[in-house]
Regions:
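Flexible glycine/proline-enriched surface loops and loop-helix/loop-strand junctions
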Residues: 7-12, 55-64, 157-162, 231-235
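Bilobed periplasmic-binding protein-like "clamshell/Venus-flytrap" ligand-binding domains
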Residues: 33-43, 183-195, 277-284
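A generic structural signal for short hydrophobic patches within well-formed alpha-helices
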Residues: 1-3, 117, 187
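Helix-loop-helix "hinge/cap" segment bordering the ligand-binding cleft or interdomain interface
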Residues: 1-46, 59-92, 166-172, 262-266, ...
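C-terminal lobe and pocket-closing loops
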Residues: 120-125, 152-252
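Solvent-exposed, amphipathic alpha-helical segments
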Residues: 5, 245, 249-260
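Extracytoplasmic/periplasmic substrate-binding proteins
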Residues: 46-54, 72-176
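Charged, glycine/proline-rich intrinsically disordered loops and linkers
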Residues: 5-17, 123-139, 211-217
């Protein structure tokens, strides 16, 4: 309904047209602000979209930390959004971020993971939580008011993993469980149909994408069709073992800059210091 108020439509394809580039995204942020809405909840929301589209890994062959230009674009955009009031100054997983996804939220949208839609966003959308007797149905909060589009760039946000315990006495059983959950097409299709998550079967997801599958939470949208189209565009060629730690330290350091407590240069210095403390083998 916020999209309809700002853009005059809540059709996912038409909303995507309005958000298909970062320049267009910025223009919609301005339109949303004029209507009293925030474009994003907080500092971290768009981070993964930028960090997943870098030109090189965080660390080069000489163990030198390299801050990609695309990550600096996130810094500049987020500072602009903060100063102009286009975000709500929240951080991922905090109470403000969660509340912004609920019935009283005034945020245009959220960059989410496939698993986050059903495991997190759905729960946050309810006026009466399931544990308090509420039902996952239209009429409870803003259940049914959300929809999904691709946004300015394709990106990824982790996944759902299953690991075996080292030294298990049931190696064959564990193998069978893992293979069934992660490689059996019928099982994975059932997981998607039951949870709305996107699973590890290209052919299975394409079958659901072309079926009459729909999500009541997403207003009847077949979001698997969108994911099946978007997933092949994701590139993971620049991932490294340092990503988790360096991404966390970079976001943490930049938050002080966004809040106006330090300059950009000081925030960068603080990042390098924290990064090298975490990974002593790296250099600035």
């Amino acid at each position: 309904s916020i999209a309809k108020d700002v853009l005059g439509t809540d059709d996912p394809d038409k909303v995507q047209e309005a958000l298909s580039t970062w320049d267009k995204f910025d223009k919609v942020a301005e339109q949303a602000a004029a209507k009293g809405y925030k474009m994003l909840s907080g500092y971290d929301d768009s981070y993964r979209v930028f960090s997943n589209n870098v030109s090189a890994p965080w660390v080069d062959s000489n163990n030198k930390i390299v801050i990609d230009d695309n990550i600096m674009k996130w810094v500049d955009q987020t500072k602009k959004y903060t100063d102009k009031g286009y975000n709500n100054k929240s951080s991922l997983w905090d109470s403000t971020w969660a509340a912004d996804q609920g019935p009283s939220g005034k945020v245009f949208g959220f960059f989410y993971s496939t698993w986050g839609i059903n495991f997190t966003l759905l729960g946050n959308s309810l006026a009466t939580p399931v544990k308090e007797g509420g039902k996952e149905e239209v009429g409870n909060g803003i259940y049914g008011d959300y929809a999904v589009c691709e946004g300015p760039q394709s990106y990824y946000w982790g996944g759902t993993w299953i690991c075996a315990a080292a030294g298990t006495d049931n190696a064959n059983l564990v193998k069978d469980v893992m293979k069934t959950l992660c490689c059996d097409k019928a099982t994975m299709k059932k997981i998607t149909e039951d949870t709305q998550d996107y699973t590890n079967t290209t052919s299975g997801m394409n079958e659901i994408a072309s079926s009459n599958f729909k999500s009541d939470f997403l207003g009847g949208q077949n979001h698997i069709k969108l994911f099946a189209k978007s997933a092949p565009k994701i590139s993971m060629k620049n991932i490294s073992s340092y990503d988790q730690g360096l991404n966390e330290e970079f976001q943490k350091a930049m938050k002080d800059y966004f809040d106006g407590n330090v300059t950009k240069d000081k925030a960068l210095d603080n990042f390098y210091k924290a990064a090298i403390e975490k990974y002593p083998n790296l250099s600035k």
